[in-house]
């Protein structure tokens, strides 16, 4: 699992916990790797770590399943993101991240104005759009790596990636079945303890 995937999952879990508890809360994973938050002396900075597992208020049966990750989709995603999925575990982690993100579709956002920017309440002064030092055409074209008849020449297109035949997609599905079985077993045991 690469570092950016881990960071995304920790941040995403944090946001869902904020929705669940209605206050800022920091999970055990965040406390382990975030020494600033763990050692914060600010009284307004409340840290809540539940002592017992808390069932998710999201009905997992309503969560949309991630798409089937075939070789064509994996190659397409690799081209778009410039991230290569070197093994089955990387594809499985991507599938889990998509499954986790699909939970957001179940969050009711009616009547909530979308946040466009964190700085929407701050003034943003702009200067007048007047050229200070106008440049000549020759000076502008000096920036081009290649010029044809006083025009910039765009670089060649990206070379397409080769499809990796190394990935065993049945292993990804096997990982998926195992993890879902563990989650269902955990949810059942937590439900039995709470009842």
Swiss-Prot record:
Annotated Gene Ontology cellular component terms: glutamyl-tRNA(Gln) amidotransferase complex; mitochondrion
EC code: 6.3.5.-
GO biological process, one term: glutaminyl-tRNAGln biosynthesis via transamidation
GO MF terms, alphabetically ordered: ATP binding; glutaminyl-tRNA synthase (glutamine-hydrolyzing) activity
Swiss-Prot/TrEMBL catalytic activity: L-glutamyl-tRNA(Gln) + L-glutamine + ATP + H2O = L-glutaminyl-tRNA(Gln) + L-glutamate + ADP + phosphate + H(+)
UniProt subcellular location: Mitochondrion
Annotated organelle transit peptide span: 1-18
InterPro entries, alphabetized: Asp/Glu-ADT_sf_sub_c, GatC
Keywords: ATP-binding, Ligase, Mitochondrion, Nucleotide-binding, Protein biosynthesis, Transit peptide
Family affiliation: Belongs to the GatC family.
Complex formation: Subunit of the heterotrimeric GatCAB amidotransferase (AdT) complex, composed of A, B and C subunits.
Protein name according to UniProt: Glutamyl-tRNA(Gln) amidotransferase subunit C, mitochondrial
Taxonomic lineage of the native organism: Eukaryota, Metazoa, Ecdysozoa, Nematoda, Chromadorea
């Amino acid at each position: 699992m690469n570092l950016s995937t881990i960071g995304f999952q920790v941040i995403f879990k944090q946001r869902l916990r904020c929705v669940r508890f209605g206050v800022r809360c920091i999970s055990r994973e965040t406390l382990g790797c975030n020494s600033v938050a763990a050692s914060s002396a600010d009284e307004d900075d409340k840290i809540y770590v539940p002592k017992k597992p808390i069932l998710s208020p999201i009905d997992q049966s309503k969560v949309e399943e991630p798409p089937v990750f075939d070789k064509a989709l994996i190659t397409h995603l690799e081209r778009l993101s410039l991230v290569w999925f070197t093994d089955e575990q990387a594809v499985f982690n991507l599938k889990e991240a998509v499954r986790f993100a699909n939970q957001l579709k179940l969050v009711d956002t009616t009547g909530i104005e979308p946040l466009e920017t964190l700085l929407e309440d701050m003034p943003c002064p702009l200067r007048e759009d007047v050229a200070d030092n106008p440049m000549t055409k020759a000076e502008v074209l000096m920036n081009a790596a290649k010029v044809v008849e006083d025009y910039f020449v765009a670089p060649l297109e990206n070379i397409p990636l080769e499809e990796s035949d190394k990935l065993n997609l049945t292993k990804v599905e096997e990982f998926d079945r195992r993890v879902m079985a563990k989650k269902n077993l955990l949810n059942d045991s937590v439900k039995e303890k709470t009842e």
